[in-house]
Amino acid sequence: MINDRIKMLREQYNYSQADLAKKLNIARTSVLAWENQTSDPAMKHIIALAKLFRVSTDYLLEIDDKRTLSLEGLSDEEISILCDLLNYFDKERTT
């Protein structure tokens, strides 16, 4: 469920609930409610979460389990570094 994805991504980014709430300009209790499955985020918050975590809205909503990473806003140098890291991890898995 989206609630689990929000918590997982928040933890992967090492954000507290308060950190995430501040980034979204909402109350910490809203993040708590999402993660506890007592409410679901509005579409504008789903879009904001997807942008913040650089994933698709489909991934957040569990329509698609493929986790894609948005490179929007990254410089060519940053993209090159990411590609080098991915290649390194691919080689490590195969050796």
Model-derived segments and spans:
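Conserved amphipathic alpha-helical interaction elements at protein-protein interfaces in regulatory
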Residues: 12, 52-55, 88-91
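DNA major-groove recognition helix of helix-turn-helix
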Residues: 35, 45, 61-64
